[in-house]
Regions:
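Active-site-proximal alpha-helix that buttresses catalytic centers in soluble enzyme cores
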Residues: 1-174
Length: 174
């Protein structure tokens, strides 16, 4: 696990499987499932590490010479400057610097798409059938400065204690 503090590296190693990194293994399984659904070549790329975005672009060009369009799907269901946006911006930079001839577009955050919500529901339903004491939802935090900066209304997010209780277009970015 390169570039990780020793404690973090040990934690990552503890979840490794014989196949390798769970993130890579599961992403490869997703790639294979998507590839079965579409005729176009499907590649995976990581914002940090390998396989890199440039390697994915190069593989796409090798697999389909004359490629005209690439549609990228950042695997972040939500918008966050520190995840979705940095992946999109880095992908654009690699595309421009590499002078790749294809057009590049991105699938927008899908946190509120019916199919995604249904998949989440289906993944938790078997566990709801069992006896349990509690359900724990774990979320990755987003810095408040990112939330404020992403507030398209400029007057909603974190302006009062009930900002999350009032429907707002700004919720798409927090």
């Amino acid at each position: 696990v390169p570039f990780r503090a020793p404690k973090s590296a040990a934690a990552y190693r503890s979840i490794w499987t014989q196949e390798g990194s769970p993130l890579i293994v599961i992403t490869q399984q997703l790639q294979e499932a998507v590839q079965q659904q579409v005729e176009a070549p499907v590649e995976i790329a990581m914002r940090y590490g390998n396989p890199s975005i440039a390697a994915a672009y190069d593989n796409l060009m090798k697999r389909q010479p004359g490629l005209e369009e690439v549609i990228a799907l950042p695997l972040y269901p939500h918008f966050a400057m520190s995840s979705y946006e940095t992946a999109v911006e880095h992908s654009k930079t690699i595309h421009q610097k590499g002078k790749y001839p294809f057009s590049l577009s991105f699938i927008k955050p899908f946190y509120n798409e019916a199919n995604y919500l249904q998949a989440l529901e289906e993944s938790i339903t078997p566990y709801l059938q069992r006896d349990f004491d509690h359900i724990l939802f774990s979320y990755h935090g987003v810095p408040q400065r990112h939330i404020r900066k992403s507030d398209i209304t400029g007057n909603h997010c974190l302006k009062n204690e009930t900002c999350c209780q009032t429907a707002s277009p700004a919720h798409a970015f927090c």
